[in-house]
Amino acid sequence: YRIKKKDSIEEKLVRHGFEPTLENAKDQLQDIAGVRIICYFVGDVNNLVNMLKKQPDLIFIRESNYIENPKPNGYRSHHVILGVNVCCLDANEYYPVEVQLRTISMDFWAAMEHRVSYKKQYDNKEQRVAELLQYSNILEKMEKEFEKYNDHPVEM
C-alpha cells in the first residue's frame, strides 16, 4: 500500500493549479492512497477487477486499462479508482483509493522502467522508449504462453 506524503500532495495540487488545501486534496486527487495487487496471470487481473467493481461497499469511480491499451513506452497495468468508506467521528465519507492490478512480469517491467528512466546513459529518449516497448512486448508474449498453466484462476 501507499499513502502519498503531505508535501507530495501539496506539490501535485499546485502543479495542477489548485490551492494546497485538505478539501482540494479530497476533491481533486484520486491517488492519495493506493494499493498494488500482483497476480501471476492476466486472467486473474481481469477477474479481480470485475470482483472489485461488484463489491457493494465500494464505489466504482473510473478505470484505466493499460493492459488492453498500453502506454507508448509499453507500460501495462490495470488501474481502478474506488471510493472507500471512511468512518469519521461525525460522518461517513467516501475517499478515492487507486488500486493497481498487474502481473509479476508487468511489475518487473515497471520497476526496471523506473530505474532506467533515471540513468544518464539514456539521453536518447526515443531509443529508450523503443527498447522498453520491445521488452514489454516480449513479456506480454511470455505471459500469453504461460496463461495455459493457470489451473487455479481467481474465480468470481
Regions from the language model: what does each represent?
Residues 1-18:
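Surface-exposed, low-hydrophobicity interaction/linker segments
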Residues 21-30:
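Short, flexible, solvent-exposed loop/turn segments with mixed acidic/basic and small polar residues
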Residues 32-39:
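Terminal, regulation- and interaction-focused segments at domain boundaries
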Residues 147-156:
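Eukaryotic low-complexity, non-globular regulatory regions
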